[in-house]
Design a protein with these regions (language model features):
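N-terminal periplasmic "start-of-domain" segments of outer-membrane beta-barrel proteins
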Residues: 12-44, 64, 72
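Periplasmic-side early beta-strands and strand-to-turn transitions of outer-membrane beta-barrels
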Residues: 128, 136-138, 144, 155-237
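Structural signature of outer-membrane beta-barrel domains
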Residues: 22-24, 72, 84, 132, ...
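Short acidic/polar hinge/loop motifs at secondary-structure boundaries
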Residues: 55, 83-111
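N-terminal periplasmic accessory domains that precede
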Residues: 34, 43-46, 63-66, 78, ...
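Hydrophobic, lipid-facing positions within transmembrane beta-strands of outer-membrane proteins
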Residues: 63, 123-125, 139-141, 154-158, ...
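Extracytoplasmic beta-strand/coil segments of soluble accessory domains associated
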Residues: 44-83
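Face-selective signature of the C-terminal outer-membrane beta-barrel domain
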Residues: 206-220, 239-342
Length: 342
């Protein structure tokens, strides 16, 4: 037996921990043309140049943004107000890959759960690409060309804003990007080629009270995107995005201003191991997938700093894996069996 004759207790002092609610390092709102980058191929490639944002690279295109160690669906990603979820079950197409940076004006990055203005979830943070368009008195246009000699990559982009009246406008922009397989110092050419095209049509007007109404349609096409570290590549990935935005600048009840937005995003995606790698006989695989999202949000401003509102989003995903065996297509498994999330 063990006997303890002296027992005493020591009183510890209190420990106080304090932290500021938010600082400037948590929120980044930058004009895209001012971000220090070299021919960013997509939104993820651009984001990695912002302090506190990293990226996962699987090929020449489709870089996946990482904020505070979190990525994919743990980041809420918006393209001009439309919530976007990638359609690939192996994360070949993170949402930011559908943002061609030549066709957007600014990007906002919020690190962590610092705001509820951009929907539920998103513990890693928020990424929001935006276009800002206002009425013009005469046509405005710009044309750009980028080239990268290593992979033979080039991007051609254009933007034009036309006045329809003193208060209405039409904006058209688009781009086309192509790249081959770059060559390493050892003479190896990894499968990193890609081909993308996209365009956007924006129709907007200022109302008599100064409020703004805008309709957007965006189309993004990705073809033959190689991923050397994965078992398959993107054969195609086609996206249609629709948004309607209304900003009321005059008081309405207790609100000094209102923002109302509706959006719909449809993505059809096919990955296989034959389009870029050639026929593989009985080992050929193909996986068609889709990701469709719709929703909206209403936000009212009260006073100078308070906001109140509501938002809704609905996402449906489908994915099935198939193989070719003995010359016949054989269904293997459902990866996303009509999965719904709200």
């Amino acid at each position: 037996a063990i006997l303890i004759s002296n027992v005493s207790a020591e009183e510890l002092t209190d420990i106080q921990i304090s932290s500021p609610i938010m600082d400037k390092a948590t929120i980044s709102n930058e004009a895209i043309e001012e971000i220090d980058t070299r021919n960013a191929v997509d939104g993820g490639d651009l984001l990695k140049n912002i302090n506190g944002v990293n990226a996962i690279r699987r090929g020449g295109h489709g870089l996946e943004a990482v904020i505070r160690g979190q990525s994919d669906a743990r980041l809420n990603t918006f393209l001009d107000g439309a919530m976007v979820y990638g359609a690939c079950s192996t994360k070949m197409d993170p949402a930011s890959t559908y943002a061609n940076v030549n066709n957007y004006d600014s990007v906002t990055v919020i690190k962590g759960t610092q705001s509820v203005l951009f929907g539920a979830g998103g513990p890693g943070g928020i990424v929001s690409f935006k276009r800002v368009t206002n009425p013009v008195t005469k046509p405005e246009y710009s044309i750009g060309q980028n080239f990268d000699s290593n992979a033979g990559a080039y991007t051609t982009s254009g933007n034009i804003v036309l006045p329809l009246s003193s208060s209405s406008y039409l904006r058209l922009n688009g781009s086309s990007s192509n790249a081959g397989n770059y060559e390493t110092g050892a003479g190896i050419k990894p499968l990193t080629e890609y081909s993308t095209t996209d365009y956007t049509v924006i129709l907007g007007t200022l109302l008599s009270d100064g409020s703004k109404l805008e309709f957007n349609y965006s189309n993004n096409r990705q073809d033959k995107v190689g991923y050397p570290g994965l078992r398959m590549d993107i054969a195609y990935s086609y996206t249609d995005m629709y948004t309607m935005k209304y900003h009321k600048v005059t008081p309405f009840g207790i609100f000094s201003s209102l923002n109302f937005e509706l959006f719909n995003t449809d993505i059809d995606h096919l990955m296989d191991n034959t389009t870029l790698r050639g026929t593989t006989g009985n080992g050929s695989m193909f996986t068609p997938t889709s990701s469709d999202t719709y929703g909206g949000r209403l936000i009212g401003k009260i006073g100078s700093s308070m906001r109140a509102g509501l938002d809704y989003e609905h996402n449906t995903k489908n994915a099935e894996q198939n193989m070719t065996m003995m010359g016949s297509n054989v269904f293997m498994a459902y990866l996303w069996p009509d999965v719904e999330a709200e």
